[in-house]
């Protein structure tokens, strides 16, 4: 076994099912996020924090309702909590659907607008496309799947890093760096 294979097997970027679009996108997005953070671009996390907060509110309402409220003794409180749970759930779903969709990372551009990075799989071309929209224009960079993952499902870091760095050199000037 060569030293390169040992390095690959120690990797946390491993896909257990090469036919799983979700898993391929998730592992690749984790790698891309890590590389972009290393380059010190300004990431916007407040929207993720809103998602986390709404999820925690749902957990608290559900837990309180199931542990402390008995329907036979307090039916009005139970109904109020269920309505609150439904309202918060609907808010979270709407927020996810309209704002996040497939977005895995939000960065700030130099002009102050948001840059939402997302990945999509093009099965016909056998590529994973890293893209973002800015001023109604879509900018894309493609990863060849056969070069992105080896036959054992390990991310080929040198190739992936090279594509991410090419993406950042081509589009990084529009992204804002941290102060």
UniProtKB/Swiss-Prot annotation:
Highest taxon in the source lineage: Eukaryota
GO cellular component: endoplasmic reticulum; signal peptidase complex
Disruption phenotype: Causes a severe growth defect in host erythrocytes. Export of protein containing a PEXEL motif, including PIESP2, PTP3 and PTP2 is severely reduced at the ring and trophozoite stages. Similarly, export of RESA is reduced at the schizont stage.
Location(s) in or outside the cell: Endoplasmic reticulum membrane
GO molecular function: endopeptidase activity
InterPro entries, A to Z: Spc2/SPCS2
Topology in membrane: Multi-pass membrane protein
Segments on the Cytoplasmic face: 1-48, 96-179
Extracellular membrane side: 70-74
Transmembrane annotation, as ranges: 49-69, 75-95
GO biological process: protein transport; signal peptide processing
Keywords tagged on the record: Endoplasmic reticulum, Membrane, Transmembrane, Transmembrane helix
Subunit record text: Component of the signal peptidase complex (SPC) composed of a catalytic subunit SEC11/SPC21 and three accessory subunits SPC25, SPC3/SPC22, SPC1/SPC12. The complex induces a local thinning of the ER membrane which is used to measure the length of the signal peptide (SP) h-region of protein substrates. This ensures the selectivity of the complex towards h-regions shorter than 18-20 amino acids. Within the complex, interacts with SEC11/SPC21. Component of a complex composed of SPC25 and PMV; the interaction is mediated via the transmembrane domains.
Family: Belongs to the SPCS2 family.
Its biological purpose: Component of the signal peptidase complex (SPC) which catalyzes the cleavage of N-terminal signal sequences from nascent proteins as they are translocated into the lumen of the endoplasmic reticulum. Enhances the enzymatic activity of SPC and facilitates the interactions between different components of the translocation site. Also, regulatory component of the CSP25-plasmepsin PMV complex which cleaves the pentameric localization motif RxLxE/Q/D (termed Plasmodium export element (PEXEL)) located downstream of the N-terminal secretory signal sequence of several proteins.
Protein name: Signal peptidase complex subunit 2
Organism expressing this protein natively: Plasmodium falciparum (isolate 3D7)
UniProt lineage: Eukaryota, Sar, Alveolata, Apicomplexa, Aconoidasida
């Amino acid at each position: 076994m060569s030293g390169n294979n040992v390095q690959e097997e120690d990797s946390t970027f491993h896909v257990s099912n090469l036919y799983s679009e979700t898993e391929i996108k998730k592992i690749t997005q984790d790698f891309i996020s890590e590389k972009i953070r290393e380059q010190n671009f300004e990431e916007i996390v407040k929207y993720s924090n809103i998602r986390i907060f709404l999820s925690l509110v749902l957990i608290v309402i559900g837990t309180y309702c199931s542990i402390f409220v008995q329907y036979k003794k307090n039916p009005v409180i139970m109904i109020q909590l269920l309505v609150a749970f439904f309202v918060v759930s609907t808010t979270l779903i709407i927020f996810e659907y309209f704002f996040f969709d497939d977005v895995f990372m939000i960065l700030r551009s130099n002009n102050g607008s948001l840059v939402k990075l997302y990945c999509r799989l093009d099965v016909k071309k056998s590529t994973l496309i890293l893209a973002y929209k800015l001023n109604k224009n879509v900018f894309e960079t493609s990863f060849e799947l056969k070069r992105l993952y080896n036959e054992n499902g390990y991310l080929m870091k040198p190739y992936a890093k090279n594509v991410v760095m090419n993406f950042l050199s081509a589009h990084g000037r529009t992204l804002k760096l941290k102060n």
